[in-house]
C-alpha cells in the first residue's frame, strides 16, 4: 500500500472523498489507512477487503470512464488530469491484480482450470476455432502461470493487463 501513496492521494482528490457521503457516514475518508487484508479460503478465488479493494473499485470505474468518455474532463469528474495522473489511477488496478492473481503459487492454482480447458481445446482433433471470454484477472493469472515474460504497453495508462485486452493462442499443424 505504501507504494500507492500518490495514487491514493490522487483518487481521494478526484473523488473529493473527504466531502463524500461515504466519509460523512464514517465509512471511508481516505485510502491510506493501510487496512488491506487478503482473504484466502479453500475452494474460492483470492479476495481482499480494505483500502486497496476500495481504491481498486474507484480506479476500475475511472479507467472505464477514461476509455468510454470522449470528454476527458467529464471522465475525471471535472478534473484536468494528465496522462501521468491517469497512469497513477491505473496503477491501483495493476497492483490489485498483481496482489490477488499473479503471485506464482496463486496464479498456477487460479489459472489451472482455465489452462486445462485451453489445453483440451488445443488438442481437440477437429477444433478449428475456440473463443473464450474472461476478465483482465484471468489474463493476469494465465500469463503469470505460463511465466510470460515482462512486457511494456506504450501509450497505455494501464501497464499490466488493460481492460479489454486479449490473449491469443494459435495452433499450427
Residue positions per predicted region:
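Signature for phosphate-centric chemistry
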Residues: 1-130, 134-173
Amino acid at each position: 500500500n505504501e507504494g500507492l501513496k500518490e495514487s491514493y492521494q490522487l483518487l481521494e482528490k478526484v473523488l473529493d472523498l473527504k466531502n463524500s457521503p461515504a466519509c460523512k457516514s464514517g465509512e471511508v475518508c481516505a485510502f491510506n489507512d493501510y487496512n488491506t487484508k487478503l482473504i484466502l479460503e479453500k475452494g474460492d478465488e483470492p479476495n481482499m477487503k480494505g483500502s486497496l479493494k476500495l481504491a481498486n473499485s474507484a480506479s476500475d470505474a475511472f479507467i472505464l470512464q477514461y476509455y468510454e468518455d470522449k470528454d476527458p474532463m467529464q471522465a475525471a469528474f471535472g478534473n484536468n488530469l494528465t496522462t501521468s495522473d491517469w497512469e497513477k489511477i491505473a496503477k491501483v488496478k495493476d497492483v490489485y491484480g498483481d496482489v490477488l492473481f499473479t503471485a506464482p503459487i496463486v496464479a498456477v492454482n487460479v489459472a489451472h482450470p482455465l489452462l486445462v480447458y485451453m489445453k483440451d481445446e488445443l488438442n481437440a482433433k477437429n477444433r478449428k476455432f475456440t473463443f473464450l471470454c474472461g476478465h483482465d484477472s484471468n489474463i493476469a493469472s494465465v500469463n503469470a502461470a505460463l511465466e510470460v515474460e515482462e512486457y511494456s504497453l506504450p501509450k497505455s495508462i494501464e501497464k499490466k493487463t488493460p481492460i479489454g485486452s486479449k490473449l491469443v493462442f494459435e495452433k499450427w499443424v
